Amino acid sequence: MQVSKDALKQLIRAGRGVIPASKVLEGGYLVNVMSNEVYLADVAIYEERIVAIGKVEEYKGPETEVIDVTGLYLLPGLIDGHLHSECSKLSITSFAKAVVPCGTTSIVSGLDEYISVSGLEGLQEVFKEVKKSPLKVFWGAPYKTPYTFPKSTVAFNFTEEVHQEVQQWPECFGVWETVREAVQEEDEDTLGALATAQNNRLPIFGCAPMARGKELNGYLCAGVRLDHESYDHEEVVEKMRNGMHMLIRESSVTHFLEENIRAVTEVNPYLARRVSFCTDDVTATDILEKGHMDNVVRQAIKAGVEPITAIQMATINSAEAYRIDHLVGSITPGKIADIVMVDSLEGFQVQAVLTDGKLVARDKKMSYELKAPARSSVLSCALKCATTTPEDFQYRVEIEQGTAEVLSMNVKGPFVRKRRDVTLQVANHIVQADTENDVLMVSVLERFGRNGNKSLAFCSGWKLKKGAMASSAAPDDNNIIVMGADASDMSIAVNHLIENGGGQVIVADGEILEFLALPVGGIVSDLEAEEIARQESLLTKAANSLGCDLPDPLMYMFFLPITAIPDYAITDVGPVDCIALTTFDPILALNPGK
């Protein structure tokens, strides 16, 4: 998004009407998010920039393309203020094809899942892919990788020294996903990244679920200025009263909008000016069935927010918070011509989308063919771990027979993991899973060829009666995670991923029930959203057939390695107490017996 002196000269001339507009949108209602107004106005565009709004007849020339938008409402391209696009299992190209027709023209992302598996070399390839896409990605450099505490294993460690380099890149718009624990523990790399950002006058993006009181104050003193993690509207209000810009998250697995928007609809309407929206993690299925940021706007309107206010939350509010409002966020002269046309403000159905002044989508479909680039070996990376045997997933203890008192990580929701103490049988020195009482084995295997780490613990909440499921896509480190009732099936599942370069798989009785290949970094695919959604449905049905009743069994599983989510997690270094930030032994006591 670099601007040359000559390009600036041409744009100024177009703004003054000296050069005719390339395109004029005529007859529509302009949603002016700057003045909080909706009124009849035309829009003149020169190449990729807006040059005039209102009466623009004098901007027309003989070659100007005039598009009749009578009756439609024109609003800025929607911005997802915090997104891991990789969690959709769609590559940037495939993701753009899915969300741009829904009106999303910009996302703010750390592209951190790509970095964790392929480093800066892979990131540069993704940047090239973004430039050929109609979707803008405003990149924040991850505050560090891995995010986990204690430190897990990734392909690339994002350190203070790396920040000193990448914060100078033109693609860098800030520091991404600064978790509270890293600040609280005064992690040296984290403090170095934040100090570098402040010296470079770059914003620092946060991740601080349940941070209140002194913890919040200390976090804010580190320079963090916005957050996307609040579990209730009181938390939103406290953070905003202390100076934070808040993003309300409405993802595929966490539906916080209805609760968090109460900060605006019930506590203080004035807060709306410093509230934005994000989806964080969204599935291909949800995009196809509900939409993307357009769905979030509709949900906000349904919750009682005025339509123009909801649109501001999805556009200019994010743009100003991330300091990108000189480029996007409003339909005003000088801004990039990312424009969404909807049928009405209340129904908010997207009819057409322009990005960079070009019509790219109409009637929820792309207007041109967008192809993914050829993949190099950097992103088509193999899973560099040894094949497994059933013994790798047997929890061995010193007693031959008896029982084991065990701490099982009990999933109550995608972001709620509590302690559950259970008693399991021990046979031939092996602690047995207990499907009748919903206790499975879970393991994470390092897959980058660094150290061969493998952890083993116990989990509850999936209710599998038999079989196993595994994934090589598992934020934040994207090592292989596998869980199951049977060690043999767990081994088969992991080996299938290794042999096929990554993906997600369901196994039972030694047979592969369903497999979704994720060949790009082992985390995403170039398949269309429709095909990913179809295969996601088959995976869920396969898990359901084994007894699981969770709405998205694999997504619930692949969030388990995130140590920023209380109270428990598991990484390649072991099961983690996310409050104490230490690994722990899941065996509480052993009781010998016959």
UniProtKB/Swiss-Prot annotation:
GO terms for molecular function: adenine deaminase activity. Its cofactor is Mn(2+). SUPFAM superfamilies: Composite domain of metallo-dependent hydrolases, Metallo-dependent hydrolases. It is an enzyme of class 3 (hydrolase). Disulfide bonds: none annotated. This is Adenine deaminase 1. PANTHER family: ADENINE DEAMINASE, N-ACETYLGLUCOSAMINE-6-PHOSPHATE DEACETYLASE. Belongs to the metallo-dependent hydrolases superfamily. Adenine deaminase family.
